[in-house]
């Protein structure tokens, strides 16, 4: 409940909050006002999706940045296993992809069908995002056991070859 007594995180029949609907529409000022009033930045709907996911999938860069500033979980997974990073990579949005990575999104996360953000970007032919994610994977694997590092880096090289074919 907000300071004014309004149920700020009340959900509609689909499980969506006002924050989610504002993020979906790219209403950055409304998103910020709701967050300042105490809206839960990481509230989930019935499919496990968050306001950040709605902003990402609809390419609302300024809304994404606002949600990140208010602590949105960049590694949250919806019921299907998808993450905001996978959604950004699948949409071909390098600016949002980079913002998510800069905020700590893990490029190693695998969704239910067994795909990473890198695989999604590769399948859709987004070469610049593939290169960005390959670099992020290399950084993410530093300090891991050599066997894991080799497997992940080998995966990235395989993906790079597939993109160039």
Please give the residue ranges for each predicted region.
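Ankyrin-repeat-protein effector appendages
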Residues: 3-7, 103, 112-115, 119-165
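Ankyrin-repeat helical core positions
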Residues: 2, 23, 35-36, 56, ...
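Ankyrin repeat structural motif
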Residues: 27-35, 60-68, 93-101, 127-134
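Alpha-helical adaptor scaffolds
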Residues: 46-49, 53-70, 75, 79-80
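Ankyrin repeat A-helix N-terminal signature
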Residues: 21-26, 54-60, 87-93, 120-126
């Amino acid at each position: 409940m907000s300071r004014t007594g309004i149920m700020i995180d009340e959900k509609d029949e689909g499980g969506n909050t006002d924050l989610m609907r504002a993020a979906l529409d790219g209403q950055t000022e409304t998103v910020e006002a709701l967050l300042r009033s105490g809206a839960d930045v990481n509230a989930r709907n019935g499919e496990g999706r968050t306001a950040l996911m709605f902003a990402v999938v609809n390419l609302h860069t300024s809304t994404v940045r606002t949600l990140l500033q208010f602590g949105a979980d960049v590694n949250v997974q919806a019921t299907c296993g998808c993450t905001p990073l996978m959604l950004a990579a699948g949409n071909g949005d390098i600016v949002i992809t980079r913002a998510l990575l800069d905020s700590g999104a893990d490029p190693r996360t695998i969704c239910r069908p067994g795909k990473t953000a890198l695989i999604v970007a590769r399948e859709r032919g987004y070469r610049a995002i593939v290169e960005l994610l390959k670099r992020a994977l290399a950084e993410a694997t530093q300090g891991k056991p050599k066997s894991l590092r080799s497997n992940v880096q080998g995966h990235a090289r395989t993906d790079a070859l597939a993109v160039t074919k």
